[in-house]
């Protein structure tokens, strides 16, 4: 039985090193899809590179934890910038949901301005779209726009409440991450999905070349290791051997 495998590289537009890593992992590896931060410092560079790589599917990486928002967000910013204090606001049930709704729409329109087309799908930086307060907003928006959505079903208490026309992969994994990156780990993710009977799977990754921006990230050198693994010829063969076809959210 053939299964769909989407290998999505997050953080397109974060930095030039990140952008080059994603393009390399697409051109010479198994990355089929990426998601772009429209407020990233290297987003224009990402747009330019993407023009020479038409096979790379591009979605939108909704950002509520980094950089400057596109709209005025007094309820979520400090000194005009976004940050990880969003977790505290979520715990206090104090998220400015109307502001978040407007920012989502603005980032979506900015994506279309930059890339000249709709994103293939939506996900988010640091998975904030899976917050219980935010998820219904993003799910409704994706369904209305006819685009797919990354769904990590583990935090969902009831995915029966999803919009009927919302598209997503059956499975999602963020396990290909950390200090123990290897081909074995990647293939274990596939085997676990197969055992669950999932016909489609998205695997999240972050391949990059290290530059000054990536050096400042808490997740730095493992991005290089990811790039090595994702461009391995033996991994591509092992994926096909397991009955997976590489694709994107266009195929969901």
From Swiss-Prot:
It is found in: Cytoplasm. The keyword Glycoprotein does not apply. Its EC number is 3.5.1.105. GO terms for biological process: chitin catabolic process; diacetylchitobiose catabolic process; polysaccharide catabolic process. One of its GO terms (cellular component) is cytoplasm. Mg(2+) binds at residues 61, 125. Pfam families: YdjC. Belongs to the YdjC deacetylase family. ChbG subfamily. HAMAP family: COD. This is Chitooligosaccharide deacetylase. The gene is chbG.
